[in-house]
Amino acid sequence: MELLIQRFQALSGMVFSNDAGLSAQLYTHLAQALERTLFSIGIDHNLVDDIAQQYPRLLRTTREAIAALEQQYSVQFTDEEMGLIAIIFGAWLMQESALQEKQVLLLIGRDSELEQQVEQQLRELTLLPLTIKYQDVADFQRHSAPKGIALVITPYATPLPLYSPPLIHAELPLGEHQQRSIRLLLES
Protein backbone atom coordinates (compact mmCIF):
# COMPACT_ATOMS: atom_id res chain seq x y z
CA MET A 1 0.00 0.00 0.00
CA GLU A 2 2.87 2.35 0.78
CA LEU A 3 4.18 2.12 -2.77
CA LEU A 4 0.71 2.75 -4.19
CA ILE A 5 0.29 5.84 -2.01
CA GLN A 6 3.79 7.10 -2.85
CA ARG A 7 3.14 6.61 -6.56
CA PHE A 8 -0.20 8.45 -6.35
CA GLN A 9 1.44 11.33 -4.47
CA ALA A 10 4.26 11.55 -7.02
CA LEU A 11 1.83 11.54 -9.96
CA SER A 12 -0.63 13.98 -8.41
CA GLY A 13 1.79 16.37 -6.77
CA MET A 14 -0.29 16.18 -3.59
CA VAL A 15 0.71 14.76 -0.23
CA PHE A 16 -1.26 12.80 2.37
CA SER A 17 -0.35 13.45 6.00
CA ASN A 18 -2.02 10.30 7.32
CA ASP A 19 -0.61 7.55 5.13
CA ALA A 20 -1.47 4.89 7.72
CA GLY A 21 -5.19 5.69 7.67
CA LEU A 22 -5.32 5.81 3.88
CA SER A 23 -3.26 2.62 3.69
CA ALA A 24 -5.72 0.79 5.97
CA GLN A 25 -8.70 1.91 3.91
CA LEU A 26 -7.01 1.00 0.61
CA TYR A 27 -5.91 -2.38 1.99
CA THR A 28 -9.46 -3.24 3.02
CA HIS A 29 -10.90 -2.16 -0.31
CA LEU A 30 -8.18 -3.70 -2.49
CA ALA A 31 -8.42 -7.06 -0.72
CA GLN A 32 -12.10 -7.17 -1.64
CA ALA A 33 -11.43 -5.78 -5.13
CA LEU A 34 -8.83 -8.49 -5.80
CA GLU A 35 -11.32 -11.15 -4.72
CA ARG A 36 -14.07 -9.70 -6.92
CA THR A 37 -11.65 -9.47 -9.84
CA LEU A 38 -10.27 -13.01 -9.46
CA PHE A 39 -13.75 -14.50 -9.20
CA SER A 40 -15.37 -12.20 -11.79
CA ILE A 41 -17.85 -10.77 -9.31
CA GLY A 42 -19.38 -7.63 -10.76
CA ILE A 43 -20.36 -4.48 -8.93
CA ASP A 44 -22.73 -1.65 -9.74
CA HIS A 45 -21.37 0.28 -12.70
CA ASN A 46 -23.67 3.30 -12.70
CA LEU A 47 -21.08 5.37 -10.89
CA VAL A 48 -18.22 4.89 -13.35
CA ASP A 49 -19.50 7.15 -16.11
CA ASP A 50 -20.05 9.98 -13.62
CA ILE A 51 -16.56 9.57 -12.18
CA ALA A 52 -14.97 9.48 -15.63
CA GLN A 53 -16.84 12.61 -16.69
CA GLN A 54 -16.52 14.64 -13.49
CA TYR A 55 -13.11 13.53 -12.22
CA PRO A 56 -11.07 12.51 -15.28
CA ARG A 57 -7.70 13.51 -13.83
CA LEU A 58 -8.35 11.72 -10.52
CA LEU A 59 -9.36 8.56 -12.38
CA ARG A 60 -6.37 8.74 -14.73
CA THR A 61 -3.94 9.35 -11.86
CA THR A 62 -5.42 6.42 -9.94
CA ARG A 63 -5.05 4.15 -13.00
CA GLU A 64 -1.41 5.14 -13.41
CA ALA A 65 -0.67 4.71 -9.70
CA ILE A 66 -2.24 1.26 -9.48
CA ALA A 67 -0.70 -0.15 -12.68
CA ALA A 68 2.31 -1.60 -10.81
CA LEU A 69 0.03 -3.34 -8.30
CA GLU A 70 -2.04 -4.81 -11.13
CA GLN A 71 1.13 -6.06 -12.77
CA GLN A 72 2.47 -7.48 -9.48
CA TYR A 73 -0.71 -9.50 -8.91
CA SER A 74 -1.36 -10.21 -12.62
CA VAL A 75 -4.83 -8.69 -12.49
CA GLN A 76 -6.67 -5.99 -14.38
CA PHE A 77 -9.17 -4.10 -12.26
CA THR A 78 -12.46 -3.26 -13.93
CA ASP A 79 -13.45 0.32 -14.61
CA GLU A 80 -15.93 0.00 -11.74
CA GLU A 81 -13.23 -1.02 -9.27
CA MET A 82 -10.93 1.71 -10.54
CA GLY A 83 -13.70 4.25 -9.97
CA LEU A 84 -14.15 3.13 -6.37
CA ILE A 85 -10.40 3.31 -5.73
CA ALA A 86 -10.34 6.81 -7.24
CA ILE A 87 -13.16 7.83 -4.88
CA ILE A 88 -11.07 6.69 -1.90
CA PHE A 89 -8.12 8.81 -3.04
CA GLY A 90 -10.41 11.76 -3.79
CA ALA A 91 -12.08 11.59 -0.39
CA TRP A 92 -8.71 11.55 1.36
CA LEU A 93 -7.52 14.50 -0.70
CA MET A 94 -10.59 16.48 0.35
CA GLN A 95 -10.20 15.45 3.98
CA GLU A 96 -6.45 16.14 4.06
CA SER A 97 -6.65 19.59 2.59
CA ALA A 98 -9.92 20.55 4.27
CA LEU A 99 -10.96 21.88 0.89
CA GLN A 100 -14.56 22.19 -0.05
CA GLU A 101 -15.89 21.47 -3.47
CA LYS A 102 -15.23 24.58 -5.56
CA GLN A 103 -18.02 26.23 -7.50
CA VAL A 104 -17.14 27.42 -10.98
CA LEU A 105 -19.40 29.50 -13.20
CA LEU A 106 -19.15 28.73 -16.90
CA LEU A 107 -20.56 31.54 -19.00
CA ILE A 108 -22.50 30.15 -21.92
CA GLY A 109 -23.63 31.64 -25.17
CA ARG A 110 -23.94 30.36 -28.68
CA ASP A 111 -21.47 27.44 -28.97
CA SER A 112 -22.38 24.50 -26.71
CA GLU A 113 -19.62 22.29 -28.15
CA LEU A 114 -16.97 24.88 -27.26
CA GLU A 115 -18.49 25.27 -23.79
CA GLN A 116 -18.34 21.49 -23.24
CA GLN A 117 -14.67 21.49 -24.26
CA VAL A 118 -13.93 24.27 -21.77
CA GLU A 119 -15.73 22.32 -19.04
CA GLN A 120 -13.80 19.15 -19.84
CA GLN A 121 -10.46 20.99 -19.75
CA LEU A 122 -11.42 22.49 -16.39
CA ARG A 123 -12.14 19.05 -14.98
CA GLU A 124 -8.78 17.81 -16.29
CA LEU A 125 -6.90 20.46 -14.30
CA THR A 126 -7.62 19.35 -10.76
CA LEU A 127 -8.08 16.16 -8.80
CA LEU A 128 -10.58 17.87 -6.53
CA PRO A 129 -14.31 17.95 -7.21
CA LEU A 130 -15.88 20.90 -8.99
CA THR A 131 -19.46 22.04 -9.17
CA ILE A 132 -19.91 23.77 -12.49
CA LYS A 133 -22.86 26.11 -12.84
CA TYR A 134 -23.93 27.76 -16.08
CA GLN A 135 -25.05 31.31 -16.75
CA ASP A 136 -25.75 33.16 -19.96
CA VAL A 137 -23.14 35.84 -20.75
CA ALA A 138 -25.79 38.58 -21.03
CA ASP A 139 -27.32 37.56 -17.68
CA PHE A 140 -23.85 37.66 -16.12
CA GLN A 141 -23.41 41.21 -17.44
CA ARG A 142 -26.65 42.29 -15.77
CA HIS A 143 -26.50 40.35 -12.49
CA SER A 144 -22.89 39.19 -12.00
CA ALA A 145 -22.13 35.75 -10.55
CA PRO A 146 -24.20 33.98 -7.89
CA LYS A 147 -22.77 33.83 -4.36
CA GLY A 148 -20.19 31.18 -3.59
CA ILE A 149 -18.54 31.14 -7.01
CA ALA A 150 -14.74 30.76 -6.83
CA LEU A 151 -14.04 31.29 -10.52
CA VAL A 152 -15.84 32.51 -13.63
CA ILE A 153 -14.63 31.11 -16.92
CA THR A 154 -15.84 31.76 -20.44
CA PRO A 155 -14.77 31.10 -24.01
CA TYR A 156 -16.36 34.43 -24.98
CA ALA A 157 -14.84 37.88 -24.68
CA THR A 158 -16.87 39.69 -22.06
CA PRO A 159 -16.34 42.80 -19.93
CA LEU A 160 -16.48 42.39 -16.17
CA PRO A 161 -19.57 43.55 -14.31
CA LEU A 162 -19.14 45.84 -11.31
CA TYR A 163 -18.37 42.92 -8.99
CA SER A 164 -17.15 39.51 -10.05
CA PRO A 165 -15.06 36.64 -8.76
CA PRO A 166 -11.89 36.08 -10.81
CA LEU A 167 -12.80 35.78 -14.50
CA ILE A 168 -10.71 33.88 -17.03
CA HIS A 169 -11.25 34.16 -20.75
CA ALA A 170 -10.42 30.65 -21.96
CA GLU A 171 -9.05 30.11 -25.42
CA LEU A 172 -8.69 26.43 -26.21
CA PRO A 173 -6.50 24.67 -25.67
CA LEU A 174 -5.76 26.30 -22.34
CA GLY A 175 -2.20 27.57 -22.19
CA GLU A 176 0.22 26.50 -19.47
CA HIS A 177 -0.08 29.87 -17.68
CA GLN A 178 -3.90 29.70 -17.71
CA GLN A 179 -3.80 26.12 -16.44
CA ARG A 180 -1.53 27.08 -13.53
CA SER A 181 -3.70 30.10 -12.68
CA ILE A 182 -6.90 28.07 -12.73
CA ARG A 183 -5.37 25.22 -10.71
CA LEU A 184 -4.09 27.70 -8.12
CA LEU A 185 -7.55 29.26 -7.75
CA LEU A 186 -9.29 25.90 -7.50
CA GLU A 187 -6.87 24.19 -5.15
CA SER A 188 -6.41 27.04 -2.68
Task: Identify what each model region corresponds to.
Residues 1-188:
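A cross-family "folded-core" feature that marks the main globular domain of proteins
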